Structure formats: C-alpha cells, structure tokens
Amino acid sequence: MRILCDACENAAAIIFCAADEAALCRPCDEKVHMCNKLASRHVRVGLAEPSNAPCCDICENAPAFFYCEIDGSSLCLQCDMVVHVGGKRTHGRFLLLRQRIEFPGDKPKENNTRDNLQNQRVSTNGNGEANGKIDDEMIDLNANPQRVHEPSSNNNGIDVNNENNHEPAGLVPVGPFKRESEK
C-alpha cells in the first residue's frame, strides 16, 4: 500500500517532509520546497517501498493492524478487541500503515537510476546542497537546519537563553511536568 501525495492526492508520495508533516510526490515536492529559500531548508526523507506486515505482539501469528501507544504493542484485529475492553478503550491506538522511511545511510537493495536521481535531489544536510552522498551522513530530524550565508539575527549578541535562566530552547525536559508554585 503506497501513500498518496498530500498535495495533489493523485500520485504516490516519494518524499516525507517533517516540517510540513506531509507526504509528497516529486512534482509537488519541487513546487512546495523549491519555491523559496526557507522551504528549501526543510528536512525531507524518501519513502521506501512498503515493508512486510509486522506480526501481532500478542498472538505472534496474525499481521498487526494497530499500535497502542499506552501498551507499546502492535496488535491484530482480534487481539485488539480482546485486550482493549472496558476502560482500555481510551488507549490511543493508531493504524499501522507499513510505510518504511529511507534515511541517509540505508543501503538500497537495488541501485537504479531513478533512486540515484531521487537521492541527489533531496538534501540530506539541511543547507540546500544535494550532492548525492548519503552513505557517510545521518540526519537528526530534531536539529535546526544549518543557516548558510545569512545575516545575523536581530538579538544584537544577547544570549536569550541565559538571560532568563531557562534551559536552551532545543532541550526538552524528561519526566512529568511540574508547575512551580507562584509566589
């Protein structure tokens, strides 16, 4: 099962843009991401051929169709109905689409011209240079894109993060959120 392009809804998607949360075909990707400098910096990864169906974590026989985020398990239809009864119906469950993502560094099973062109057009380093070298680099989808040849920001050298005694903006606290009591 292929994912359709979120923009045109006609062609099969070959790219996933993390910033836009959109799966796009090649023509729509070029329209959306090559139209301006800011959009061209979005981290995009190629969508691979759909993988085989994972097996259910409970019965280990039937193909899994659901993923329960509370239980952290993949479930077939039958096991999902058995496990999620009563109060467990409130568990957030998601449909498994069996869509693999191609990350830089993944070794393709067969090396054809179409895949090489796709890898050369999609930037893996965030600065717009698409040189086709994906074997030595890994990308961090959580990292901010590198800014090249741009004027400095308008904060005039003030360290915004240290001025208000907050953690750096890229760090996310681990554990439950605790609200400090107001004085």
UniProtKB/Swiss-Prot annotation:
Composition skew (Low complexity), residue ranges: 154-163
Subcellular location as annotated: Nucleus
Organism lineage string: Eukaryota, Viridiplantae, Streptophyta, Embryophyta, Tracheophyta
Organism: Arabidopsis thaliana (Mouse-ear cress)
UniProt GO cellular component terms: nucleus
Binding site for Zn(2+) 2: C56, C59, C79, H84
Residues of the signal peptide: none
InterPro entries referenced in this protein's UniProt entry, alphabetically: B-box_zinc_finger, CONSTANS-like_Bbox1, Znf_B-box
SMART domains linked: BBOX
The protein's name: B-box zinc finger protein 19
Record PANTHER family: B-BOX ZINC FINGER PROTEIN 19, B-BOX ZINC FINGER PROTEIN 22
Keyword DNA repair: no
Transmembrane segments: none
Gene name of this polypeptide: BBX19
